[in-house]
Amino acid sequence: MSVLIVGMSHRSAPVSLLERLSMDDSVRGETTQALLGRASLSEALIVSTCNRLEVYTVTSSFHTGVNDVVEVLHEASGVDIETLRGYLYVRYADAAAEHMLVVTSGLDSMVLGEQQIIGQVRTAYQAANEYGSVGPALHSLTQTALHTGKRVHSETAIDDAGASMVSFAVDRALVQMGLDSEAEAPLSGKTALVLGAGAMSSLAATHLGRAGISKLIMANRTLERAERLAEHSLEAGVPAEVVEYDQRASAYNRVDLVVSATGADDFTVKPEDIPEGASLMLVDLSMPRDIDDACADLPGVDLVNIERLHKASREGGSGMAPSEEEALAIVREELDSFTSEQRIRDIVPAVSALRRQAASVGSDELDRLRQRAPGISEVEWGEVEKTVRRVVDKLLHQPTVRVKELAARSGSISYDSALQELFGLESLASTAAPATTSVNASELPDAGIVAFVNAPSATQTRE
């Protein structure tokens, strides 16, 4: 049984496809149960964000597991299987562990080192726990990934700038407004309308406040949540008010920016609602999108959304910063520790079985001896039993210790080397010429897995 990841992200798929696979809590729960309904899959956890959809599962069969996950995604999203195969990537066993550590550390995010992803992975884990779909394998891997993410953020300077997708979006909006995002208060004298009152909206309000916004207007379907967000802004020293969600369009003519992060079923901002001649900067932080793209066709109206942010991130620099190198070193360290522990854990059942078998053989031989030598006194018999058990324990002690040490290492070992290592034998010099074997690559069976796009790993340079 090994961990399998099947997913797609901003690196492998267009936003339009990511939108179709985006899952709310209800769909994620249904999809998780559908995954567990497949015989090849025993655990399941789904990470669904604006920039990625990844299924983490544990499978008894790689090929069957991949096909089962793809079929479930097809059933959940309505996207045909061939389209999915063209954009999905696959990670398995150690590569799957590495991928989760890289993702949770923010090293595969659209904004390098962004902190939101660690919370999103934690939320996905908590949801899977509630569904009863997390077992020992995903529990251990997720906890290691979360620990690694915390180390990356606390031990490196990767998030010194407080980068997140929200800050990236607001900074892009400032540039398009002709404002200097590096200035102390570039939004001084400006007013913004924030639609939604969840985590993304709260982050947006915070970032707008840091950028010197003069006033915030909040609107949300649940009025109390909008009022609570406004109170937080007031406590931070930013003037704020609340408008009814259905009356949000009435605020368009008195704001400079509209930031939307509601995840609504319908567009929150439509072209017909924008007053003629209005000058607006629209920022859409939702997936699927909140703001109708057609709004950007209106004179004086500009738009930043997830798709445009993807394009901007691809146009950014490609060099690796020192903090990224430090972060990758932490990932490698944690990955080595995790994979070693997993290999040791995997060998424990075999070691236990070996000890049980040896104990059983010893007991059987003692029974035979007792029948053949009935005249042995109880005191003498007690010494015989102790001696036999000591011999068995001494014979097995070094092999069981060494097999765990060998299991912790990656790579393979020859049979004669294994015997020498396990039992502490002297090197067996052989005068015979070593046997050689050749393999014709063309004769190897076709792997037959779905197509996948390479994503950066802890041993690769970020795009």
Swiss-Prot record:
The record's listing under Pfam families reads: GlutR_dimer (PF00745), GlutR_N (PF05201), Shikimate_DH (PF01488)
EC assignment: the record states 1.2.1.70
Q: Which reaction does it catalyse?
A: (S)-4-amino-5-oxopentanoate + tRNA(Glu) + NADP(+) = L-glutamyl-tRNA(Glu) + NADPH + H(+)
Q: InterPro entries under this entry?
A: 4pyrrol_synth_GluRdtase (IPR000343), 4pyrrol_synth_GluRdtase_dimer (IPR015896), 4pyrrol_synth_GluRdtase_N (IPR015895), GluRdtase_CS (IPR018214), GluRdtase_dimer_dom_sf (IPR036453), GluRdtase_N_sf (IPR036343), NAD(P)-bd_dom_sf (IPR036291), Shikm_DH/Glu-tRNA_Rdtase (IPR006151)
Any one Gene Ontology BP term: protoporphyrinogen IX biosynthetic process from glutamate
**One MF term in the entry's GO annotations:** glutamyl-tRNA reductase activity
Catalytic residues at 50
Where in the chain is the site Important for activity?
Answer: 99
Write down the superkingdom of origin.
Bacteria
The pathway this protein participates in, as annotated, is: Porphyrin-containing compound metabolism; protoporphyrin-IX biosynthesis; 5-aminolevulinate from L-glutamyl-tRNA(Glu): step 1/2
Q: Identify the keywords attached in UniProt to this record, alphabetized.
A: NADP, Oxidoreductase, Porphyrin biosynthesis
Q: Where along this sequence does the record place binding of substrate?
A: 49-52, 109, 114-116, 120
Family of this protein: Belongs to the glutamyl-tRNA reductase family.
Question: What quaternary arrangement does the UniProt entry report?
Answer: Homodimer.
> Any other noteworthy remark?
During catalysis, the active site Cys acts as a nucleophile attacking the alpha-carbonyl group of tRNA-bound glutamate with the formation of a thioester intermediate between enzyme and glutamate, and the concomitant release of tRNA(Glu). The thioester intermediate is finally reduced by direct hydride transfer from NADPH, to form the product GSA.
Please describe what this protein does: Catalyzes the NADPH-dependent reduction of glutamyl-tRNA(Glu) to glutamate 1-semialdehyde (GSA).
Name by which UniProt lists this protein: Glutamyl-tRNA reductase
Q: Which organism is it from?
A: Corynebacterium glutamicum (strain R)
Q: What is the lineage of its organism?
A: Bacteria, Bacillati, Actinomycetota, Actinomycetes, Mycobacteriales
Gene designation: hemA
